[in-house]
Amino acid sequence: MRRFICSLLAGFMMLPLMAIPLHKGCLPARDNWYGSPESMIVAENVLLLQRNNGGWAKNYRKYRKEMSPEERKQLKEIRAQISESTIDNKATYSELVFLAHQYQANPDKRYVKAFKRGIEFMLSLQYDNGGFKQFSRDKGYYTHITYNDNAMVNVLTLFWHILQHDPLFEPFVNEAMYKKIQASFDKGIDCILKTQYVQNGVKTVWCAQHDEFTLAPAKARAYELPSLSGSESVGIVHLLMSLPNPSADIQEAVHAAMAWFDANRITDHRITYIIDEEGLRDRRWVESTKGNDLWGRFCELDTNRPFCADRDGIVKYDISEIGYERRNGYGWYTDAPLQLFPIYETWKQDLR
């Protein structure tokens, strides 16, 4: 699991409460790094790896490598693989924020062109109902409205920085694009409000992905079942509390989500680690009150009970009941909601 994190960039103007998270490939190596020889290598590779539809693939690890002519030729050939372009795992918006910083140090017009194409790619992922899918694909769970790993939230956060006329992005956006981004942002917030799950007449939180037609919680991979997410909902609530002059609908959504978080703390169990008989580090779910309260990443839609599942998709209530690989290779519990409570108290005071 990738927790919701805020990557703070030196000298970067932040929204109140929210910053734009970047994947490691585009993070500055040190202060005053933009414009350095290494950053120029990264910039060339970012331009080289932009797909023909304007997006970037995820999990690329070699942005800092100086490519040989043969390697550059091979990478150019994959530009046509547009189905790999995504907003998952911080892809595309990381590259765009990097280019914006790099432009300040080295105003190359190619960065402007690439940035605009990247924004258009993001806009192309949005449905009329305001939700964003994570890939430009037409089949499988990739078509769902995706809150998983904060994909949609991170795009909206970037858009919000742009709409606030953050100086970092001013060279890239004209009035026509501002209007597109404003319309997209407004639809995105509306979609968030419409997808908040209502349980027995009471609003709760969100699933990691929602059906693009019905807006109902949806399944992704076999072990990612329709549920209420104690993880992905954190980024959504954080974003909503970052908006100035929140409407009555936004206020209601935040209050309801925070009530759900407060009511569904896990106070009596914790994750611990053992060394098993084969000498491998293994997770266990044990009775304990030490450390932070936890929340389930997946909670049943009707009971709020946390659960887990293996690749067979069968619901279990203890990670010891699923295989080693999924037990240790996925984040089933999180303490991320803890960060919301002090922010929520300040937010409530500001409403008065």
Residue ranges and their predicted role:
Residues 112, 116-119, 123, 139-196, ...:
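Eukaryote-skewed repeat-based solenoidal scaffolds used as protein-protein interaction platforms
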Residues 7-16:
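Bacterial N-terminal signal peptides
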Residues 42-54, 114-131, 181-201, 253-270:
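Long, well-ordered core segments of solenoidal/helical folds
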Residues 26-35, 77-91, 140-152, 219-232:
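Solvent-exposed loop and edge beta-strand segments that line ligand/cofactor-binding
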Residues 36, 40-93, 98:
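N-terminal carbohydrate-binding/catalytic regions of secreted carbohydrate-active enzymes
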Residues 20-42, 161-187, 213-220, 224, ...:
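Terminal, non-catalytic domain-edge segments
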Residues 1-4:
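Positively charged n-region of N-terminal signal peptides that target proteins for export
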Residues 56, 61-63, 69-79, 128-139, ...:
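Intrinsic, low-complexity N-terminal interaction/targeting segments
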